[in-house]
Every structure is written in C-alpha cells, then in structure tokens.
Amino acid sequence: MATSSRPYLCYALAARQSARHLSRLYDRHLAPAGLTVSQFSILRLLKEHEQLKISELAEIMIMERTSLVRALRPLQASGWVVAERSDDGRAFDITLSASGMEKVGEAIPLWAEAQAAFEGEVGRDRAIRFRDEISELNLAG
C-alpha cells in the first residue's frame, strides 16, 4: 500500500512542528534569564563536561560546526563562555566562565518550569516516552 503524500503525514514536518512548539515553550520560560533553549543547552552541556572542543560539542548537539560557532558568539560576548586554543593549536577548547556557571544556576529553575509545563500539556509519562523515543532516534542516526 502506498504512503499518502498529504503534508500532515510527513514525519519531518511533524518533527519540525514539535521542535518549534517546544522551542517556543522553553524560550518563554528561559526569557527571564536572557537565554534561549539552544543557549541553555550549550551552557548546561559545558557545565556537565567542563571542557569540550567545538567539534565535540557540535557532535553532542547534532549541529553543524559552523552553526555552533554562530550560536557560541553571543554566549562569548556575554562572558559566559570562553574559547581558547587547545594545546595542539588546531582546535578550540570551550569552557564556562564563572559568570556562565552563575547563568546556568539562574536558568535551571526556569528550565524545570518549562519541563513541568510540557509534562502538564501531554502528561508526564507521555513526555518521558516522547523524549526517550527522540533520543533513541538521535542515537541511531
């Protein structure tokens, strides 16, 4: 049986619509900290890993390196992220500054509110299944 070509059956469209919805939800909650969800994700990953090369962070984020560099610029300009040449001089090591650590601390409760808001929309169990399914797809890709 042939798959219908109706736009609302497109997996990519549905995924992008969901991503936009979630981004708006998280951005709204993180706005008091002056962060977008993408910026928060970068800061949170740097806090967890302490130091990453741009290529490592891009791989974790599943982003093009050039897109990540553009995303890092405002974080560097705000003084939250520091980029220094690695010992071999061929790559950049990215770390959080002290003010970046403070910014993550300020944003975590706002992020938790966004998590709770999404769980309120779809139910906690469904939200967890949704996250786990997406994570599984990302790891398989």
Give residue spans per PLM region:
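Pre-recognition alpha-helix immediately N-terminal to the DNA-recognition helix
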Residues: 21, 25, 41-44, 102
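Charged, amphipathic alpha-helical coiled-coil/dimerization segments
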Residues: 73-132
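The alpha-helix within a helix-turn-helix
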Residues: 58
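Short, locally clustered residues in the helix-turn-helix/winged-helix DNA-binding domain
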Residues: 44-48, 108
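Residues within helix-turn-helix
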Residues: 54-55, 66, 73, 92
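The N-cap/first-turn positions of alpha helices
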Residues: 36-42, 100, 115
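Short capping segments at the starts of secondary-structure elements
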Residues: 49-53
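N-terminal leader segment of winged-helix/HTH proteins
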Residues: 1-33, 96, 125, 132, ...
